[in-house]
Amino acid sequence: MNLFHLQAPFQATGDQPQAIAQLVNSIEKGNRFQTLLGATGTGKTFTIAATIEKIGKPTLVLAHNKTLAAQLCNELRQFFPENAVEYFISYYDYYQPEAYIPVSDTYIEKSASINDEIDMLRHSATRSLFERRDVVVVASISCIYGLGMPSEYLKASIGLEVGKEINQRQLLRDLVSVQYSRNDLDLQRGRFRLRGDVLELVPAYEDRVIRVEFFGDEIDAIRYLDPVTGNSLQSLERVNIYPARHFVTPDDQLEAACQGIELELEDRLEELEKQGKLLEAQRLGQRTRYDLELLREVGYCNGVENYSRYLAGREPGQPPECLIDYFPKDWLLVIDESHVTIPQLRGMYNGDQARKKVLIEHGFRLPSAADNRPLKAEEFWEKVNQCVFVSATPGNWEIEQSQGQVIEQIIRPTGVLDPEIFVRPTEGQVDDLLGEIKQRIKRKERVLITTLTKRMAEDLTEYFQERGVKVQYLHSEISSIERIEILQNLREGEFDVLIGVNLLREGLDLPEVSLVAILDADKEGFLRAERSLIQTIGRAARHIQGQAILYADNLTDSMIKAMEETERRRNIQMAHNKRHGITPQPIVTRSSNAILSFLDISRRLNAQQLEKVYDQADELPLEKVPELIGQLEEQMKEAAKKLEFEEAAKYRDRIQHLRDKLLGH
């Protein structure tokens, strides 16, 4: 019996059936790695969903950012409405890591804002992995960070069953020990209340209320309640209450951890004093002893993750346990856009260690803090059972690992061909391009233009605007929310031409684009490498009349390879259409409104305007202060994202000042 039940309004077509059969065959043979080389718009997600259904293994789908993970999760939930499709990304709305800048002697404390809903989804993912096998978890790369110990997390869960006798007081103590808090007035996720013989709690992994009714010390009934109406939704025979936090440390292990921290502290202080670093020694001793006192008293301290090696009982250098360790041994990994995700996977460890090294050297953290880290690439691959790489342009490493198991998916279900490619000289390229743009505007089609430099993109935008073309420029400083809005405006025809330096990022699903123009196509480098050219040309692959113009005076190896690969795909597609009598049909895709509906997009003041408003904050009406705080928080998050810690700290202090102003009134 199949664990997964795929539901789709269409059947596999084109070369999807062949790709599905080959993937399933390769995985069932026990091959560790295989690659799905799928052209843009060929329905790779459907192919993966069909493969998951036939293989029937718990699956982790890895994406390289939150937005792409959300899109994949939504698609897979539509394909598997009866199964557990979970979403696991970093739960921080805003995260500024602890940092020290030696040049200015500036220490910045860790500051973070946790998204409660995402935290609930993370708990829901681990709960599903414990309770069922028909699970697909769509995760960002943050899943390689430590997540407590699955064995301790499961051991700490509280099992309740109708008819079971249990001491109510002991049950309350058990709930507190797994990080639930009592609140008889405001029942929220991670809280419980007791009224007479009725216990109500909201578990960490969902927003429904669990009601446990007692008759003496015997459990009489267990029900799910609607959190708003209080109506009974479902009666249960038994239920497991999992801890409110993933990091669970038993009392005996906590004391052993504290003793280990003390021993390391003594050794490190001696080492620093021998080096003449008296300030660093004093700083480290004071901070660590304060943390130890908190750990012993309340079992928690700010920055507790820096002691995770001791709390989890790991040896020095031993990899942390993460989401992957919650999967059973026979799990399946799918890496989407593998040509981007795998390099990101390799870089996570090095970036984390560089920041920690500075903190350790200057006495802010013990050397063991370096073990609070993401997995190294080699540690990650040691945990992988079987893997499918998915990309239109897989990297050499993926191809090598697949050892011949590279499955192509070239045919689009709609019959649309890869774009025609034209090479034109750079002399007079701008005026030539202007003529092409005007033709597309007449047909109500859209144009993408990619340049090599920001300056050229700006100049080109200005040039076209002066000639009456509705054009916008997409640059790296635009936030992801604004970016989605700009792309939506392009699709809806508010402007006709989009210019940018790197238009390879995910989310450029634009069926209205019929022309992609690549300027300076013969300048070798990352943005004009073979894979980058294929990806960029593919932006026009969703339009029946898709074309790509490469402006160049020479033919580089990358250009030749990209054109040969595109022509090879076109020939396969044309032969398939001719053989089956298929007439290409326009690709219809979901508008970005589905994403925008989840985002509160409002016009934001720029940094300079915010400075002026903040300077006059004392004269600002009280009802306007929360709005200013919200906009300052946006700037703080952007600064932290760019690793501008001092700037982010400045915004944090201003936000606190404004909150104090509100409280003072």
UniProtKB/Swiss-Prot annotation:
Residues 626-661 form the UVR domain. NCBIfam families: PRK05298.1, uvrb. ATP binds at residues 38-45. Keywords: ATP-binding, Cytoplasm, DNA damage, DNA excision, DNA repair, Excision nuclease, Helicase, Hydrolase, Nucleotide-binding, SOS response. One of its GO terms (biological process) is nucleotide-excision repair. GO terms for molecular function: ATP binding; ATP hydrolysis activity; DNA binding; excinuclease ABC activity; helicase activity. A motif (Beta-hairpin) lies at residues 91-114. Pfam families: Helicase_C (PF00271), ResIII (PF04851), UVR (PF02151), UvrB (PF12344), UvrB_inter (PF17757). This is UvrABC system protein B. Residues 25-176 form the Helicase ATP-binding domain. Residues 429-595 form the Helicase C-terminal domain. It is found in: Cytoplasm. Gene3D superfamilies: P-loop containing nucleotide triphosphate hydrolases (3.40.50.300), UVR domain (4.10.860.10). It comes from Gloeothece citriformis (strain PCC 7424).
